[in-house]
Amino acid sequence: MDETHENEASDSFDPVFENSYHDDVTFNTEDDDEPPLEPRFKYERLKGEETLPFMKTATFTSIDLHDKFIAIGTATGLIYILDHHGYGNFDSVPPLKPHRCAVSKVKFDETGSYVLSCANDSKIVVSGVGNDKLCCTINIQVMPKSIYFSPDFIRQQSGHCFIMGERNLVLYEKRMFQYKASSLYSGSERDGFIHCCSWNENLIAFTNDTGTRVYERGAERIITSVQPSHDVDRVRSSRSPPKHTWMPENNLVIGWADTVTILKIRDDDGVKKGEVHHIFHVSMFICGISYIPESGIDNMELFLVGLQLEGEDFDDCASVISTVTTLTALESSACTILKTSVIRPLGLKEFELQSEDMIESVKLSNHTLPYMIHGLGIPYLATYFILTTKHIIMAVPYGPEDGIRWRLKYKLYDEALDMAKHNADLLSKTDLSPKKVGRMIIEGYLTGKRARAAASRLPLICGECKEEWEWAVNQFEEVKLCTLLAEVLPDGTPTLDPECYQKVLIACLFNNVKQFRKLVQTWSPDLYMTSFIIDRTQWRIQQISKSGNLADVDETERVLMDALAHLYLYERKYESALKILMSCQDFQIFNVIDKHQLFDLVKDQITELMNINSERALRLLLDNADSVEPSFVMEKIGRQPKLQLAYLTKLMSRNEGTEFADKAVQLYAEYDQKKLLPFLRKNANYNVNKARKLCSDKGYIEETIYLLAKSGNHYDAVKMMVREYRNMEKVIDYCKDQNDPDLWIHLLGVVAEFPAHFSQLIIEASNCLDPLLIMDKLPDDSDIPNLSEALDKLLVDYTNHAELQQCCYDSTLNDLNVLTQGLISAADESVSVNIVSRCSLCAQIIINSNQETTKKFSDIKVFKCGHIFHLACSTSEMERRQSIEEGLCIACSDQIELINV
């Protein structure tokens, strides 16, 4: 039986698939909330399929691609040349009829000028596509399993070579009149058939049951061999044939059964050898393999086409291989699904699944085997084709529109919006523009009862577009969730129609009163009609008061009243606003008064303001001191002494209110004693005697002592300090500050009443008191503790003091003697007068050579200090000053006056 027709099955095509964007694909995920992998491709029928009758009746057996054409081999031996959209011009390029049976393999040369085909009729045929110069038919004795053109087939003097694989790999090279066959590899029966071969530059790869080998032309040797990593006996190559694809930089990708192997051909000093970089298993039987060039060699991605087996005993390919002897048994135990995957190799045996599509729209029978499906691609055109026995499917990379639709389907709204914005120019005139996608997202969130998420994304979706914001407000109003817009609605750029803001305010008024108040406080009143909101707020307050159904009626009313006060302020109804704020005891009333200068409206309600916040009320009173007299304020708060005290404290800190100093002393004494003494020290406007009597009556010791001292009654102050403090250090410091000897004597008399303190006084004040006076004041009939030690210290201190005085006297006397001796020595010295000596007053030379010496000396005046004067200069200067004693040097007198200054 013809092998190509063995187990041939007719597959049906779902008509819904024609215009689908992967919406009908079913993904098996454990978590329904987690979206599947994003598809990388969409799958379309060729547009020309409906125009070609043979497409509906033919059974396809092979396919090859060129940049311009598709070659389709059929079971009847015909080869159709179509463009990539499935259209064919059979007048110019009629169908080829090279074989009498099903076409096993078909290949284009690199230029697309010739098609190489083979079949089980033992023929290899080179057919021309608009060219017949190199056309030929070669009859052989075996049934070829694989064929491939040389890369330079059409080039002159290249030999126009191609290869054929059966058990042997044979090279056909054109001679003068016929092709010459040369065996490159001879295989045995154990090696099986060569089901796949490929040619890249001078490297020929071919695969049989024992593995994949790479043959180097020129060196004419096999440079590497890779053994299969699956069980060849269980998965026969005739049912699941291997697939090759060459990537840049001599990387060979081998897809065979459920394994993928990536082989790198390296050139080490002119010697080529192969290295396996990746080898791993996938969950399908591979029917086609290609790559995605944009990913690059270092981060390559592979495009795989295959069959996944599902059934009672077929959860994955591993179970198929382990439970079924051959794939022919699949017809009774499994169903097949056409599948594509994009994978990225990681390590030697690891890969990352980038996308996975189960194309269930293509209905395959249970008899479908991997050799019946073909997958090819033109990587640099990003175009990939899948061939079944009845259909040609084109896999086109997802565009922005497809990606957005997929994201919207799986509710990946943020990603969909990002993609729409990134491709805004491309999508501006489509139904997936950023604007329309944004609306779809909002509607999706609202339909899915995720209104809060929808609201949070409005700034990103609507941006500064007024129309979009107003549309969104209407959408939220329809679902009665306008309260969610309170935090996101723009109040600047753009500015919406007043109705939009009013809808949100009314929604918050009836559902979230705190949010309503916040909006009233933060939104500009220019955004909405304040009169309308005031009317609705008043009606709502009345409704709440009458119903009494709310659990927290008082709190709700208070919040709404606060909001109403702000609305009145916007309407400049200040009296109504202040009345509400005052009744609610709202702290904000002070800000309102300051901002709008409304003190005159509340100056009669000072007590109420004090009850709200005394600190702010006092500040308000002081800031408006010109509008209200302190006496008026004191009268208003007369029944609240603590408020009076706070007011006077603030008032006097500004050096005002001196007439209330005595009142302040009284209030401090009653309510804040800690501040009384600092006030007494700082202020000088109170009556000292009244203050002293008040402090004395209340038993305020420190304040009383201070007032006694301030009134000059130091004796009583000292006496009180000794009796109350019993701390001699403070008393002694006080006496030292006064520097009054009589006060010390008084202190001794007072301390004599307390013998326990007498020793301490002697020790602390020994330098300030006369020892004889201390001895005289010692009590005769009292036992003074530590008296001997105190007297010892007194005598030691007195002795030291006397010695210090004597030393100072001796030192001073010695200094006087030294200075006197120096003065006498200076007076005994002669004064030299020469030709360069000058008068100390007029600075002229004393000795003039034009005058006689006797005359010159009779005209000068010389002092022992060394200063020389003309007699005339000295006489006139002394007469002018009249303050210089006779016989004193004028120059020295000037220096003494300068020092004194």
From Swiss-Prot:
Record bears the keyword rRNA-binding: no
Keywords assigned: Apoptosis, Cytoplasm, Cytoplasmic vesicle, Endosome, Golgi apparatus, Lysosome, Membrane, Metal-binding, Protein transport, Transport, Zinc, Zinc-finger
Traits of the deletion mutant: In 1-cell to 20-cell stage embryos, there is defective autophagosome degradation with an accumulation of lgg-1- and lgg-2-positive autophagosomes and paternal mitochondria close to the nuclei. Clusters of cell corpses in the distal region of the body and show no dsRNA uptake. Reduced number of gut granules in the adult intestine. Endosome/lysosome fusion defects in coelomocytes. Double knockout with either sorf-1 or sorf-2 RNAi results in larger endosomes and larger lysosomes and thus suppresses the endosome/lysosome fusion defects in coelomocytes in the vps-41 single mutant.
Region described as Disordered: spans on this chain: 1-37
Pfam family, one: zf-RING_Vps41
Membrane topology classification: Peripheral membrane protein
Listed GO MF terms: zinc ion binding
Positions of RING-type zinc fingers: 839-893
CHCR repeats: from-to residues: 618-760
GO cellular component: clathrin-coated vesicle; cytosol; early endosome membrane; Golgi apparatus; HOPS complex; late endosome; late endosome membrane; lysosomal membrane
Family stated for the protein in its record: Belongs to the VPS41 family.
Name by which UniProt lists this protein: Vacuolar protein sorting-associated protein 41 homolog
Originating organism: Caenorhabditis elegans
